[in-house]
């Protein structure tokens, strides 16, 4: 009988680095994936996911090397702790980024082998992470509260990028309606 291998993560913006990690984990046995919920992702990373939990679950289940996947019901960094007790995996596989003392301790308490994988890309591909993908797509912006388009050439010499221009003016209606004094 093949061993049960557990992995956890958000797996938002699914990319070749995720697939390579899952394929490497599958060399240890059948892979079971605990996905962080949208709420957990927001709590841990301070942002909403690009793909919601149902879409991430659908994509994860479609990967050939994944035996089963589920959305973890807990919260925080060990959001999967109840599920791991029910699943009773033989091995918990993490990459270097996911290697934290809390996971090691949980594995010691549950008598689960703890394996740390290096981040290795599939042959002929570069190392990929969600963070690097987000950096590629990052659009620099600045807010111009001063001169509007007149200062654009000067400001662009120092920091290029999109500009959000806004005008700030008192709104008496808001102040009167909310009972605030002016």
Model-derived features with residue positions:
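ATP-binding N-lobe of GHMP and related small-molecule kinases
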Residues: 135-182
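Nucleotidyltransferase catalytic core that binds NTPs
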Residues: 1-134
């Amino acid at each position: 009988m093949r061993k049960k291998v557990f992995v956890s993560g958000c797996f938002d913006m699914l990319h070749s680095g995720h697939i390579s990690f899952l394929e490497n984990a599958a060399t240890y046995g059948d892979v079971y994936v605990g996905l962080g919920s949208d709420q957990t992702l927001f709590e841990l990373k301070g942002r909403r996911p690009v793909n919601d939990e149902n879409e991430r679950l659908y994509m994860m289940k479609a990967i050939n090397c994944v035996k089963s996947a589920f959305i973890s019901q807990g919260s925080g960094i060990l959001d999967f702790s109840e599920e791991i007790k029910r699943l009773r995996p033989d091995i918990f596989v993490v990459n270097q980024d996911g290697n934290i003392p809390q996971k090691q301790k949980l594995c010691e308490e549950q008598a689960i082998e703890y394996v740390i994988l290096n981040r290795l890309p599939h042959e002929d591909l570069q190392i990929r992470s969600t963070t690097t993908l987000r950096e590629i797509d990052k659009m620099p912006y600045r807010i111009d509260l001063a001169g509007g388009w007149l200062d654009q050439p000067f400001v662009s010499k120092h920091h290029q990028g999109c500009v959000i221009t806004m005008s700030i003016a008192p709104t008496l209606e808001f102040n009167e309606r909310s009972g605030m004094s002016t």
